[in-house]
Amino acid sequence: MNSTDLYEIQKLLYLYCERLDQGDFPGMAELFRHARFVTPGDAPAAVCDPAAIVEMYRNYTRIYPHTGTPGTKHVVANPIIDLAADGMSASCRSYIVVFQGIEDFALQPIIAGRNLDRFEKVDGQWRYTERQICTEHYGDLSRHMLREFGPGSAAAPAAPK
């Protein structure tokens, strides 16, 4: 793996976080145009369409009108990237922690877990082919989610019909 490949894959990880935190669901979903997006939960669903990913996030994520954002900071850490021998595909496992801080809600971690990603290089550009979100730790999601989510809830983001 050369340093350019490593940088371009890491950049995709960071763009996901940045776009979510900006409330740019269409921009975030576009990163997965050629990917299978697997949601967390007891019955995970695979979403393979950017419009469906946008709908899913809009159905579950609270956006604050005065900022147009969810008031979050997604932090990706410890990415371990493995490049295939031919240099045309890669996998990555990383940690994700989401912090939220808004006017009446002190800054705190609200959810954490792992992302399991796959990538391919097409025409010299890296792109996602799969993202699997594995949620492992839950904090106070009351200011972040529009629907019940987490241990004991009946809901986890499912693919829209």
Label every PLM stretch briefly.
Residues 12-15, 59, 118:
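Alpha-helical scaffold segments in carbohydrate-active enzymes
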Residues 5, 33-35, 110:
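Short acidic/polar micro-motifs centered on Gly/Asp/Asn
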Residues 66-161:
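A beta-strand edge to alpha-helix "cap/lid" segment located at domain peripheries
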Residues 25-96:
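A solvent-exposed, acidic/Ser-Thr-rich amphipathic alpha-helical stretch
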Residues 1-4, 45-48, 107:
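A structural signal for alpha-helical segments
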